[in-house]
Amino acid sequence: MIGKGIRIEGLSKRFGKGDTAVYALKDVNMQVAPGEVVGLVGPSGSGKSTLLKCLGAVIDPSDGRMTLGNEVIYDGGWQVRDLRALRRDKIGFVFQSPYLIPFLDVTDNVALLPMLAGGANAEARAKALELLTALDVQHRVHAMPSQLSGGEQQRVAIARGLVNRPPVILADEPTAPLDSVRAMAVIRILNDMARKFETAIIVVTHDEKIIPTFKRIYHIRDGVTHEEAGEGREFE
């Protein structure tokens, strides 16, 4: 059984072979505890997107080891049989754009994943409503995506990422299109949800407004990471 938190050890990704091989990631080490939100920052082309794709089982790493809770999921090769189930049930995604399905209402946008996993419709909608209530958009459950504000759409996207209670959330530039007030609201929500559901959250960002809120930050440049303590500034 997969538990909580994520640990990455010696993770590398190279393209090509032999003398012509190019490393996009080199010996990356990270650890994110249950209930923790960490920042991953770096310039364009530094390897952030490649790292997220490896962590999300979208592409295969070349070397290294990844552990979710107490289960090794990658050790020189994938240790789980069904990568689609891993992505659906164990790793949640929040993107810069919400990517809500335009012809489904708010509830069904969130409930779709547990339905696809074989859950009963009523149970899936109950899970969706619980999260939408926690995110203070319960009054919009029957609205269509086009009727929502940008901030409401992002909260629905966060609910969708959390609905299967994944141990890990990968958030890729979740505040990029938002002003300062809405950006801080999203980060506050991610922190609240991390604590509530014991989720480990990695936030990839260029957003200078939110970087001071992280207690721990991983910097990545040329595929190499190093960790430093963040300010952990209180939300205004």
Task: Identify the meaning behind each predicted range.
Residues 64-75:
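Conserved ABC transporter NBD signature motif
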Residues 104-113:
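Short coil-to-helix segment of the ABC ATPase nucleotide-binding domain corresponding to the Q-loop/switch region
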Residues 144-154:
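Conserved ABC ATPase signature
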